[in-house]
């Protein structure tokens, strides 16, 4: 029995193979840039613990050119947004109370003063208006050309360590009181009976209602917890400052109502 085989010349074989291949368009070397990519995965357990996993690899990507000003603006916005939201989500999902802290004396030496503009998480400004011998506090959008009011922060030493909550932001918690920079004798007070925040004149002894625990969520995001009422924060309600109990809020509502920005 005979068998016949058909031999295909190598040149023809290569030619046939080439026809089956689809060549992708080549990019100029100037358009290709090796880029390190890191992906972060998070898994939250029922206990509130968040497990993090990171995987990194390199890829080539067509470069996109931005002006230095645009690139820097995008970078800052991304950093603030990411840092703020990661810490906020961590605080909110914790089953442990956000802060439990003990203090000795109500009046302790001031260690630092800092002046800054205060705005809400939605970029509305906090303004102080003096009317009929007292101040009114408003949360509003600024008119064109209107300057932001400045708030004077006085930082105090707590004299005793904070309660361990498993939240690393506790190590950055400070005791503060707040007043308009143009009238330092008036301080923010927490009115627990009316669930409101008021500016009252203080000359000598400062009551506990005038002290708040400053939680640093990021370089720009902060929140203010009542010293004498743990779990209750300065927040925004009906375009005014009010006292908000975090346990009664959803996560999104908590972020929008109790987080403030410094600038």
Curated annotation (Swiss-Prot):
Site (Cleavage): 103-104
GO terms classed as biological process: macrophage differentiation; positive regulation of cytokine production; positive regulation of inflammatory response
Stretches the record annotates as Disordered: 1-28
Top-rank taxon: Eukaryota
Signal peptide: none
Region described as Interaction with RELA: 62-103
Residue span of region Homeodomain-like HTH domain: 1-65
Family matches, as PANTHER family: DVS27 PROTEIN (PTHR21114), INTERLEUKIN-33 (PTHR21114:SF0)
Comment, domains: The homeodomain-like HTH domain mediates nuclear localization and heterochromatin association.
Assembly mode: Forms a 1:1:1 heterotrimeric complex with its primary high-affinity receptor IL1RL1 and the coreceptor IL1RAP. Interacts with cargo receptor TMED10; the interaction mediates the translocation from the cytoplasm into the ERGIC (endoplasmic reticulum-Golgi intermediate compartment) and thereby secretion.
Designated name of the protein: Interleukin-33
């Amino acid at each position: 029995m005979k068998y016949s085989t058909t031999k295909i010349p190598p040149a023809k074989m290569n030619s046939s193979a080439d026809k089956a291949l689809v060549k992708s368009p080549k990019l100029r070397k100037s358009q290709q840039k090796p880029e390190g990519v890191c992906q972060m995965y998070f898994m939250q357990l029922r206990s509130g613990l968040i497990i993090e996993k990171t995987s990194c690899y390199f890829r080539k990507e067509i470069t996109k050119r931005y002006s230095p000003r645009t690139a820097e603006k995008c970078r800052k916005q991304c950093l603030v947004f990411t840092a703020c939201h990661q810490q906020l989500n961590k605080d909110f999902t914790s089953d442990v109370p956000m802060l439990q802290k003990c203090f000795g004396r109500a009046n302790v030496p001031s260690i630092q003063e800092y002046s800054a503009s205060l705005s809400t998480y939605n970029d509305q400004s906090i303004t102080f208006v003096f009317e009929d011998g007292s101040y009114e506090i408003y949360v509003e959008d600024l008119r064109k050309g209107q300057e932001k009011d400045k708030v004077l922060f006085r930082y105090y030493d707590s004299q005793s360590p904070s309660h361990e909550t498993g939240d690393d932001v506790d190590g950055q918690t400070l005791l503060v009181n707040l007043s308009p920079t143009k009238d330092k004798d008036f301080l923010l007070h927490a009115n627990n009976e009316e669930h409101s925040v008021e500016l009252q004149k203080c000359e000598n002894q400062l009551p506990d209602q005038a002290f708040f625990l400053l939680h640093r969520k990021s370089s720009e995001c902060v929140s203010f917890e009542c010293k004498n009422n743990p779990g209750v924060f300065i927040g925004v309600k009906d375009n005014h400052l009010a006292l908000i109990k975090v346990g009664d809020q959803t996560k999104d509502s908590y972020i929008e109502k109790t987080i403030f920005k410094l600038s």
